[in-house]
């Protein structure tokens, strides 16, 4: 703001306030001196001499318009250069009135929007590549550089090592698979190979040895498992054949270690001979047919009972004593016979061919049998309802 200082030379002095003392005279913000000039400049609530109000960058006097940032004052151009949008190529500020180019989020001056390789300024419609550092490369230069890079990264020619050099390196490897630097330098001097070539040869040699050991171990384990599988197959076949032989041999085994039943003694027998038992159960001389076993009666068999040896695995617990005559009881069916066996009925035999025990058992006073042997041809004719004949049976009282 431009102000006029009231002075003695001012014709309209009565219209202005006079300063009564030096303390009332404003101090210039630029030179810190009292302003006694006719015109005073006021910026940011501070007073300035007209000659002290200058741009902080270009030092040009500011008379018409100025821009401030903090305590500094700038002209328009310098203010936008410092605090305005900057060019992505030259990092300089761009005035708001200047025409610019944009590539994504980057802004360029017209003369800065150019290829960094051929320095050709890119016009509207040209194809280009935007690098990560905001630099621009035209399409032709980019493809050329890419092809050159691909050619440079091609496989290099292999280094040829003579037999003498190889022998020297092998001897050194046998002494130390991982030699020190001074040893590699000495080998490089002796063989005439590059230091890097010697180092790579030792690295490859160690890797090869490690791989060979690993392959050898894998082969040993594979052979071991194959042998185990083969041995298991052989043992399985042997086991099967052994089982078959065992089945045949088991079929031929006979229990010959035990003495025959006829040779067993009487020291630990269950029953004594029938001659020592009750007279009612002893057999008479002569061959008599066997009679059916009635309910509650014991009929001796054709062969005598033998005692069983105490040490035999087929031994039974000892009998407390000889058999006593069984008490008489009334049988459920006194004359039950099996006609197809050809044996006479116990109640119909004349008694001449029966032993006293059998005669005694056949003479029981029980109800007559409901079985008929007439019209049925040997099979009993039972009534239609089982209850009609089951109810007539008197249960024995033991």
Curated annotation (Swiss-Prot):
GO cellular component: nucleus
DNA-binding region(s), chain positions: 154-213
GO biological process entries: neuron differentiation; regulation of transcription by RNA polymerase II; ventral spinal cord interneuron specification
SMART domains: HOX, LIM
Compositionally biased tracts (Low complexity): 272-282
Annotated localization: Nucleus
Keywords from the named record: Activator, DNA-binding, Homeobox, LIM domain, Metal-binding, Nucleus, Repeat, Transcription, Transcription regulation, Zinc
A Gene Ontology molecular function term of the record: zinc ion binding
Protein origin, superkingdom: Eukaryota
Primary role: Transcription factor.
Record protein name field: LIM/homeobox protein Lhx3
Gene that encodes the chain: lhx3
């Amino acid at each position: 703001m431009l102000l006029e200082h009231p002075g003695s030379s001012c014709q309209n002095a009565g219209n202005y306030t006079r300063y009564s003392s030096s303390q009332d005279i404003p101090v210039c913000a630029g030179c810190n001196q009292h302003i006694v000039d006719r015109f005073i400049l006021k910026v940011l609530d501070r007073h300035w001499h007209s000659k002290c109000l200058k741009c902080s960058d270009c030092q040009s006097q500011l008379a018409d318009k100025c821009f401030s940032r903090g305590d500094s004052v700038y002209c328009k151009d310098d203010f936008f250069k410092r605090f305005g949008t900057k060019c992505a190529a030259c990092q300089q500020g761009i005035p708001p009135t200047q025409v610019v180019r944009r590539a994504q989020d980057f802004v360029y001056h017209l003369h800065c929007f150019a290829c960094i390789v051929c320095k050709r300024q890119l016009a509207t419609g040209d194809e280009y590549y935007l690098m990560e550092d905001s630099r621009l490369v035209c399409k032709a230069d980019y493809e050329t550089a890419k092809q050159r890079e691909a050619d440079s990264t091609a496989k290099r020619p292999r280094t040829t090592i003579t037999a003498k050099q190889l022998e020297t390196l092998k001897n050194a490897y046998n002494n130390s698979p991982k030699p020190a630097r001074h040893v590699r330098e000495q080998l490089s001097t002796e063989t005439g190979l590059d230091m890097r070539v010697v180092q790579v040869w030792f690295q490859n040699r160690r890797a090869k040895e490690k791989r060979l050991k690993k392959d050898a171990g894998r082969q040993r384990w594979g052979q071991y498992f194959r042998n185990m599988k083969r041995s298991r197959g052989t043992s399985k076949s042997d086991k099967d054949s052994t089982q078959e032989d065992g089945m045949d041999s088991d079929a031929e085994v006979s229990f010959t270690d035990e003495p025959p039943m006829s040779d067993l003694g009487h020291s630990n027998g269950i029953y004594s001979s029938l001659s020592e038992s009750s007279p009612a159960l002893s057999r008479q001389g002569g061959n008599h047919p066997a009679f059916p076993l009635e309910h509650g009666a014991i009929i001796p068999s054709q062969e005598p009972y033998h005692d069983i040896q105490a040490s035999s695995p087929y031994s039974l617990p000892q009998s407390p004593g000889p058999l006593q005559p069984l008490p008489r009881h009334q049988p459920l069916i006194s004359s039950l016979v099996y006609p197809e066996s050809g044996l006479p009925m116990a109640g119909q035999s004349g008694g001449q061919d029966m032993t006293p025990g059998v005669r005694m058992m056949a003479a029981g006073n029980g109800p007559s049998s409901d079985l008929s042997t007439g019209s049925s041809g040997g099979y009993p004719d039972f009534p239609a309802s089982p209850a009609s004949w089951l109810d007539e049976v008197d249960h024995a009282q033991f």
